[in-house]
Amino acid sequence: MAFLRCEIASESLRMATAVDVILPDQGELSRIKTLYLLHGLTDDCTGWTRYTAVERYARERGIAVVLPEVQRSFYTDMVYGLSYFTYVSEELPAVCRRMFGLGAARKQNYIFGLSMGGYGAMKCALTYPDRYAGAASFSGVSDLRCTIAHRSLSLQETEITAIFGEKKAVPPKDDLFVLAERLSGDAPGIYLSCGEQDGLYAANERFSAHLASLGIAHRFEHWPGAHSWDFWDASLRAALAYFFD
């Protein structure tokens, strides 16, 4: 495997930004599967490689892994800030295909994330279901509207304003429940997990029930666990097995 730490000039962000990439050293890159792996609110693009065995898991399956950096943006095109959703969902895949020759076919592309990144992964997959074969959310912020209303995140008021504007309201385009209702065509495969001692467990139960009520096939797995890297490493293994084995 090759591990690349890159700084790319992003047009949508109007600045240089970090992205880590794990590439197999065998096989034609245009034919392999690519996993976009998203970080959480208090991490950066190095978290997954520092605290899990993602490179080993990628080697075992011969897949590429792309780990972008989005700061504390909640994977949104911020009202007062940068266009991180556009970057992750549109610009970054195009850059990876141009620079590394990764495949563009839906069947080759997957997106996973933890916590804030779990929200981001679901948002990308539900907004653009034709681009991803599968998506996974681990301890995801699935009910963002409720979470923001109850100030259940370690976001400052100024950060919430920067992301969503003065009203601090989550618009429909950023609400996973609404995006699921608007889903048309074939849904990507969906995998959800959450620890039973996690403060986000009830929200993930609600989201799973909502998907079920809409007839959207998915798997929701839960077991004793907290909002922790131990749980996310286990979830990553489970999701990789679900989609790739």
Give the residues covered by each predicted segment:
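Non-catalytic cap/lid and distal C-terminal segments of serine-dependent acyl enzymes
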Residues: 1-245
